[in-house]
Curated annotation (Swiss-Prot):
Annotated GO biological process: translation
Species this protein is from: Caldanaerobacter subterraneus subsp. tengcongensis (strain DSM 15242 / JCM 11007 / NBRC 100824 / MB4)
Pfam family, one: Ribosom_S12_S23
Classification lineage: Bacteria, Bacillati, Bacillota, Clostridia, Thermoanaerobacterales
Keywords linked to the UniProt accession: Methylation, Ribonucleoprotein, Ribosomal protein, RNA-binding, rRNA-binding, tRNA-binding
Protein function: With S4 and S5 plays an important role in translational accuracy. Interacts with and stabilizes bases of the 16S rRNA that are involved in tRNA selection in the A site and with the mRNA backbone. Located at the interface of the 30S and 50S subunits, it traverses the body of the 30S subunit contacting proteins on the other side and probably holding the rRNA structure together. The combined cluster of proteins S8, S12 and S17 appears to hold together the shoulder and platform of the 30S subunit.
HAMAP family in UniProt: Ribosomal_uS12_B
GO CC annotation terms, alphabetical: small ribosomal subunit
SUPFAM superfamilies attached to this UniProt entry: Nucleic acid-binding proteins (SSF50249)
Entry annotated with the keyword RNA-binding: yes
Designated name of the protein: Small ribosomal subunit protein uS12
Subunit structure: Part of the 30S ribosomal subunit. Contacts proteins S8 and S17. May interact with IF1 in the 30S initiation complex.
Residues recorded as bearing 3-methylthioaspartic acid in the entry: D89
Length: 124
């Protein structure tokens, strides 16, 4: 245990918080190019074919990003915007693709939570 004098002289060492999305290097989003677009299965107890893309970011780092929403138009060489945010049942997927930005089209026929999926307001 440190003495009062040691605390005055050196202080306490603060614990550095580890980034949840290190590949973004402190940026809110990063642009990247799709290298592979495929599906994977989630871990137990869930069952589905989750759409994911391997994306090479502008800083040269390659990450696995989740494609949210129903249906997508992404393929190899598509330019996408990537944000942080993990997918709980897909190990190793710590990023998400932003729908409605760059080459990623918004989700069609989306009525609720539209801004999250880049969907325009439906006509009356």
């Amino acid at each position: 245990m440190p003495t009062v004098n040691q605390l005055v002289r050196f202080g306490r060492q603060s614990v550095k918080k580890k980034s949840a999305a290190p590949a973004l290097q402190g940026n809110p989003q990063k642009r990247g190019v799709c290298v592979v677009v495929r599906t994977t299965t989630p871990k137990k107890p869930n069952s589905a074919l989750r759409k994911i893309a391997r994306v090479r970011l502008t800083n040269g780092i390659e990450v696995t990003a989740y494609i949210p929403g129903i249906g997508h138009n992404l393929q190899e060489h598509s330019v996408v915007l990537v944000r942080g945010g993990r997918v709980k049942d897909l190990p190793g997927v710590r990023y998400k693709i932003i729908r409605g930005a760059l080459d990623a089209a918004g989700v069609a026929n989306r009525k609720q939570a539209r801004s999250r999926y880049g969907a325009k307001k439906p006509k009356k």
